[in-house]
């Protein structure tokens, strides 16, 4: 929505990717299936999952309760799928991420085969490394295994420290570059910049609550969902980043913004979001939307 509303030729302000690191347990959850199905349908090419595929849960191996072909499952959702055979192969993971970023029409799943408890001589690839601390003696063995002083804690090697400091400097420079671009954008598109700054600050336009409908008490009264729908439509034109919908219940919960189109793979400026019958994903997606400055998400369903 931000990109569709504010990006202009030569000013690609909003083009970031969203990453999720997913465990075997995350992949099993029903909400994961709902969200992944919808993301594939909407062709959200900016979404990248890194799947920590270690085959271990708290109770033991995933084969106790799970034997799905996750890669094929996500392909059926319309995702771009890659596999990295070794979770310690940084170059292979980097290449997979770069490939995923080139994919514009499909979200990406990168299945990375990892070893839980890697470096622990007695607990690697076991459930013991999942839900409990390694313990002092095992931790000492891990340090020795990696060539660290076993008597020291919170060890950060010099080359690691240098690497992160370089990344920090690179990030600072990218931030400066973005703000330089934004200052130029502000000169060329002052109205759009002013609107974005207001909404991203958490403030609302001064006139947002002008001419709101008034509901008088009566014998019959009005269902709260009907009143809510009228209120949403009354403020929608004044709040351009108000976006939401329902889990296939818009006619009943009155969440449709009648003056605006639906959000779709072809129209990211649409403001009516069709979640399908995916209530769990709807809740998670709305929370994710709320993390983006400026966007005001809403949703509705029946509670029984």
What are these regions (language model features)?
Residues 1-18, 83, 166-304:
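Thiamine diphosphate
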Residues 1-166:
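Glycine-rich ThDP/TPP pyrophosphate-binding loop and its adjacent helix/strand module
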């Amino acid at each position: 929505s931000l990109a569709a509303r504010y990006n202009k030729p030569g000013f690609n302000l909003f083009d970031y990717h969203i990453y999720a690191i997913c465990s075997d347990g995350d992949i099993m959850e029903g909400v994961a299936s709902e969200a992944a199905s919808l993301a594939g349908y909407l062709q959200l090419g900016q979404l990248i999952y890194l799947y920590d595929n270690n085959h271990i849960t708290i109770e033991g191996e995933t084969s106790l309760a799970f034997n799905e072909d996750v890669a094929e499952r996500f392909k059926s959702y319309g995702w771009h799928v890659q596999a990295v055979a070794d979770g310690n192969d940084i170059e292979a993971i980097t290449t997979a991420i770069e490939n995923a970023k080139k994919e514009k029409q499909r979200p990406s799943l990168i299945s990375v085969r990892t070893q839980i408890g890697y470096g622990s001589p007695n607990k690697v690839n076991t459930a013991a490394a999942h839900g409990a601390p390694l313990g002092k003696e095992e931790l000492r063995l891990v340090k020795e295994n990696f060539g660290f002083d076993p008597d020291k804690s919170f060890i950060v090697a010099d080359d690691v420290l240098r690497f992160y400091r370089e990344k920090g400097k690179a990030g600072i420079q990218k931030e400066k570059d973005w703000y330089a671009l934004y200052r130029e954008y502000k000169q060329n598109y002052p109205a759009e910049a002013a609107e974005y700054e207001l909404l991203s600050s958490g403030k609302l336009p001064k006139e947002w609550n002008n001419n709101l409908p008034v509901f008088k008490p009566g014998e019959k009264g009005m269902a709260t969902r009907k009143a809510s729908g009228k209120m949403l439509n009354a403020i929608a034109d004044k709040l351009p980043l108000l976006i939401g919908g329902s889990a296939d219940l818009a006619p009943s919960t009155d969440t449709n913004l009648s003056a605006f189109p639906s959000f779709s793979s072809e129209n990211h400026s649409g403001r009516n979001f069709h979640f399908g019958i995916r209530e769990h994903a709807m809740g998670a997606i709305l929370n994710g939307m709320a993390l983006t400055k400026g966007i005001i998400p809403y949703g509705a369903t029946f509670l029984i």
